[in-house]
A protein has these predicted regions:
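Helix-to-loop junctions at the C-terminal end of transmembrane segments
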Residues: 60-74, 319-332, 417
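Structural signature of the two symmetry-related core transmembrane helices
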Residues: 77-92, 335-350
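A membrane-interface helix-boundary motif in multi-pass transporters
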Residues: 184-223, 415-440
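Multi-pass alpha-helical transporter architecture, strongest
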Residues: 10, 94-97, 224-235, 435-459
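Intracellular juxtamembrane helix-capping segments at the cytosolic ends
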Residues: 140-153, 373-387
Length: 459
């Protein structure tokens, strides 16, 4: 029987959600895609390629790493080293952006035009490489982090612990936005411009932030990610590590993937759930990657206001995540997931149909409310379907399936926009891309209906 871990350990685990959500929002969602596509004039497809390469790397490496993690029952070292590398690569984006891009900072806010400057392929190549490494290592840490939860609380408390972690993560989103936005435009969202002396001092203190613009947000994001991950590095531990070294080969690791797929059939609903995760995680990842550029391009929000938009939308996500954790323990993770994904389908259709920015705000607030439901409920859902000692390889398999799907999602979005925009206009192209995401959610619902109700973790 799993005993509740000390408060300091559980809090440090939850605080890692706070840390990695700063990266997820500031880099994967808010600043990098807009900087690359709007400021530097690159195509949506180029961004999708960088995202897809990181997903392919996850697909190729996670089976081996998950097998090694389960064999030695050690999760923390993987979380720690992947996080450190992600922070270094994230900072490298800012360094490269301010040393290899010919026009930087505030000058890129108006974007690259057909008659103006264009960054060279060599410059863009290394920026994409840094982003790919940062995104890959950020994603690769997730299955090991999620698997740590099984040893931190008894099964009946998994929903609440997962919900607290997700809610704390969205608090991290807000804190990350507030602390990084002064490096972008010298102001705080909802507050306005900061004193020039304060902004100048911040940019002097933090290296490679001396220019305004999105390029100056990546180094502060990396530092915040590392800072708030430190408590997990220091206070969390692997509860039942195997001290003997275990040899794991790539061939055996990928053989274990097939074995895990076969073993999933022994646990009712596990296969259908993993396939559903394949689809809904792809859908969420695609929306997260392109929401900022959708708001600017399709809804015509003024450039720079996407920070305020995401800040406001994150507030209901905090309460929604905690509520989802409570519902997960009350009615079960399956029902919570079904309700959350049905809400996603309805709200994305509404987002396509709303004609005004006010309507978009309303729909966005509701999306924020349900946004944390999936990560909150899916961790207890998987733990309720499988034996606890196999958590590492099944969490790795779930990440593997979602990353394999994620190769398709952003690429389909990028191709849809690039093909339809010249023919039907920007608004139609981006709304058509959202329809592809709705289809992914709808298919995942059909699969989740085949998963039985479960309330306790298998032992």
């Amino acid at each position: 029987m799993v005993q509740r871990a000390p408060w300091r350990e559980r809090a440090s685990w939850a605080l890692y959600d706070f840390a990695n959500t700063i990266f997820s929002m500031n880099v994967a969602t808010l600043y990098f895609s807009v900087w690359l596509i709007k400021d530097l004039g690159a195509s949506s497809t180029l961004y999708a390629i960088g995202s897809d390469i990181s997903s392919i790397l996850v697909v190729l490496s996670v089976p081996f790493l998950g097998a090694l993690s389960d064999a030695r029952r050690r999760r923390k070292p993987w979380v720690m080293w992947f996080t450190i590398v992600s922070c270094i690569a994230c900072a490298a984006i800012g360094v490269l952006g301010q040393t290899s891009i010919p026009v930087i900072g505030a000058q890129t806010i108006n974007g690259a035009g057909a008659g103006g400057w264009h960054p060279g392929f060599h410059s863009l190549f290394w920026v994409i490489v840094a982003f790919t490494i940062a995104n890959y290592t950020y994603q690769a840490a997730q299955p090991f982090y999620n698997a740590m939860m099984a040893d931190l609380a008894p099964p009946e408390e998994h929903g609440r612990l997962s919900g607290i972690g997700t809610a704390v993560g969205y608090v991290g989103t807000i804190v990350g936005l507030l602390l990084v936005s002064p490096f972008f435009g010298g102001e705080l969202p909802l507050v306005g411009p900061l004193p020039q002396g304060l902004v100048a001092g911040l940019r002097t203190w933090i290296p490679f932030t001396s220019h305004a613009g999105r390029v100056s947000t990546f180094v502060p994001t990396a530092l915040l990610f590392l800072l708030f991950a430190l408590p997990l590095f220091v206070f969390c531990r692997d509860h039942h590590p195997v001290l003997e070294k275990t040899a794991i080969s790539w061939k055996r690791a990928f053989g274990d993937v097939l074995n895990t797929l076969r073993d999933a059939r022994k646990y009712p609903g596990a296969t259908s759930f993993i396939l559903a995760s394949f689809l809904y995680q792809d859908a969420i990842g695609t929306i997260v990657s392109f929401m900022a550029i959708y708001a600017i391009k399709a809804m015509h929000f003024p450039d720079g206001t996407e920070t305020t938009l995401f800040l406001v939308l994150t507030v209901p996500a905090i309460f929604g995540s905690y509520l989802a954790g409570y519902l997960t323990d009350l009615i079960g993770p399956r029902r919570t997931l079904l309700f959350t994904i049905m809400a996603w389908v309805v709200l994305l259709i509404a987002m396509i149909l709303v004609p005004s920015q006010k309507g978009f705000w309303g729909v966005g607030l509701l999306i924020g409310l349900v946004f944390g439901g999936v990560p909150t409920a899916e961790r207890p859902m998987l733990l309720s379907l499988i034996p606890r000692e196999e958590a590492g390889r099944f969490f790795s398999l779930m990440l593997l399936s979602s990353r394999a799907a994620a190769v398709a999602g952003p690429l389909i979005w990028g191709i849809t926009v690039d093909v339809l925009e010249p023919l039907r206009g920007t608004g139609t192209a981006y709304r058509a891309a959202v329809i592809t995401v709705v289809a992914m959610f709808a298919l995942s619902l059909l699969l989740l209906r085949r998963v039985p109700e479960t309330r306790a973790v298998r032992h």
